[in-house]
Curated annotation (Swiss-Prot):
GO terms for biological process, alphabetical: photosynthesis
Role: Component of the cytochrome b6-f complex, which mediates electron transfer between photosystem II (PSII) and photosystem I (PSI), cyclic electron flow around PSI, and state transitions. PetL is important for photoautotrophic growth as well as for electron transfer efficiency and stability of the cytochrome b6-f complex.
GO cellular component: chloroplast thylakoid membrane; cytochrome b6f complex
Protein's name in the database: Cytochrome b6-f complex subunit 6
GO molecular function, a single term: electron transporter, transferring electrons within cytochrome b6/f complex of photosystem II activity
TM region positions: 4-26
Annotated membrane topology: Single-pass membrane protein
Organism field: Amaranthus cruentus (Purple amaranth)
């Protein structure tokens, strides 16, 4: 259970970071 929780936590963190970087790049392109 612990490994599954940590796996989903890591996946969620990676997705959040990727989304943040993608949005940041889009904002830079718009400016």
């Amino acid at each position: 259970m612990l490994t599954l929780t940590s796996y989903f936590g890591f996946l969620l963190a990676a997705l959040t970071i990727t989304s943040a970087l993608f949005i940041g790049l889009n904002k830079i392109r718009l400016i």
